[in-house]
Amino acid sequence: MPQEFEQIRSADQPLDSEESAPVAGARTDDTVDALDAVLDDIESVLETNAEEYVGSFVQKGGE
């Protein structure tokens, strides 16, 4: 059964935050670009030496 929560807004708070939308969009674009860069780095490492990369995350002999 889904739960519904009532959102309480003050009289000062606008219903639509049109002013903050461009800023949020820019932040999202920056975040997406940064994430893409990290994923590209991981992909290039995996292409060159996947075994060593995965081995760095695996415990050996109870370490």
Curated annotation (Swiss-Prot):
InterPro entries: Ubiquitin-like_Pup. There is a cross-link at E63 (Isoglutamyl lysine isopeptide (Glu-Lys) (interchain with K-? in acceptor proteins)). It comes from the Bacteria. Pathway: Protein degradation; proteasomal Pup-dependent pathway. Keywords: Isopeptide bond, Ubl conjugation pathway. Residues 19-57 are annotated as: ARC ATPase binding. GO terms for biological process: modification-dependent protein catabolic process; proteasomal protein catabolic process; protein pupylation. Residues 1-28 are annotated as: Disordered. The keyword Transferase does not apply. GO terms for molecular function: proteasome binding; protein tag activity. Protein modifier that is covalently attached to lysine residues of substrate proteins, thereby targeting them for proteasomal degradation. The tagging system is termed pupylation. The N-terminal unstructured half of Pup provides a signal required to initiate unfolding and degradation by the proteasome but is not needed for pupylation, while the C-terminal helical half of Pup interacts with ARC to target proteins to the proteasome. NCBIfam families: pupylate_cterm (TIGR03687). Strongly interacts with the proteasome-associated ATPase ARC through a hydrophobic interface; the interacting region of Pup lies in its C-terminal half. There is one Pup binding site per ARC hexamer ring. Belongs to the prokaryotic ubiquitin-like protein family. This is Prokaryotic ubiquitin-like protein Pup. The gene is pup.
